[in-house]
Amino acid sequence: MRIKTLLAGAVAAFALTGPALAQDVAITGGQVLTGTSVVENGTVVIRNGKVVSVGTGAAPAGMRVIDARGKVVTPGFVAVDSGLGGTEVGSVRGSNDLSNSANTLTAAFDLSYGLDPWSFTLPVARLGGVTRAVVTPRHAGSRAGHSHDDSDFAGAGDGGYQTPGLFAGQAAVIKLGGTDILVKSKVAMTAPFGEAGAAVAGGARGAEFVLFKETLAEVRAFARNKAAYDRADMRALSLSRADLEALIPVAEGRMPLIVTVNRASDIQQVLRLSREEGVKVILDGAAEGWLVANEIAAANVPVLLHPITNLPSNFEMRAARMQNAAALNAAGVVIAIKGNEGSAHRARDIRYNAGNAVSHGLPFAAAIQAITVNPARIFGFDGQFGELKAGAAGDVVVWSGDPLEPFSQPSAVLIDGVEQPLQGRNLLLRDRYRTGGEGAMPPAYGR
């Protein structure tokens, strides 16, 4: 009987992510928030998995129609700094493929090989309107600057981690539908700065910045002299060949570096480092970013933030406040709002966090952009998803009401034009064990 139950669960899990064919479909009659504008009584037409038009005309003859009258239509949300597809049960090391504790492979760590399209976290995130995600590796040596749900990295090693390197590895972009979820690997490098980075470098911020500059110098020397390196005809370098190769695009300014940093003075140092070394950076966290908002804007550096961070949980967040998102946006900084930081299970919180940012001064339109078009643009996917426009992916969510209101729910979720099941393991368990009345036993008890 237990085997039958397990098999049934496996079949149900596959049904939540199984492959399907894109359909030509028109979504009509709703208020369409394209990501950059609003179309009342709009029609979104999708063919072959792509948006072909957004306007107010009638649906093409013979096309399947989703009636969105009285509803709100948005692009699928884009979760950033997420663990979706890379971790299942945070306290179980074997189900976590987001971090690598070996100091022999740091920058070259590519989490895309460990992504699981059958992860139970993906359908739950889809129920929150998330259709794409930037999955970022976690630095194995420090939790500073992050608050992970479900003790994401507790018990992750026998006797603790090895001393990790400066870099956590390379991020990937995924879609939350189908069995081939990888959109692109190696979209960004990740590294902790501030308290977390200081811990890696020996305990002081000054050591980390010197170490980072020295690392870039080694990478550039390697890039110029690969033949000499192979002949062992140059000085010994501190990183493995794989790590050196992985960092060449960062040193050349072609791959962005996601820097976890929160203290205002640390942000200033990161901006200076970016300027001096020609490194393209993305600030992750920036809890005190509002103090230096004009400097961030002048440097044209985007920010990934958790807008409800408002407690001085450590000495690099003494000035954290819930108006951070509004202040950064007002200064002209491109922001992307996160779900719970580093989370797989609470990536769906992205819309709640955007709503909280609105309640603390962020304009509604800017909040929608911060969970749709902005993250797509930050990671180099402008016009490809996160926006309802001709040529973009057919990632669309139809909402019962304001998508930033907790009580609004999706009535349809499409990814690449494929309508997704509005179901998740959490809801399957709810339905299975729903009593149906006082005194009634759950179905499994009668088996």
What are these regions (language model features)?
Residues 30, 44, 49, 70, ...:
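Divalent metal-coordination and catalytic microenvironments
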Residues 32, 36-74, 91:
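Histidine-rich, glycine-flanked metal-binding segment
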Residues 30, 42, 389-433:
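C-terminal cap of metal-dependent C-N hydrolases
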Residues 1-21:
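Gram-negative bacterial Sec-dependent N-terminal signal peptides
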Residues 274-280, 298-304, 332-334:
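Glycine-enriched alpha-helix->loop->beta-strand junction motifs that scaffold or abut catalytic
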Residues 89-90, 96-108, 256, 297, ...:
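His/Asp/Glu-enriched, well-ordered alpha-helical/loop segment
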Residues 121, 126-281, 409, 444-446:
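Polyanionic/metal-chelating signatures
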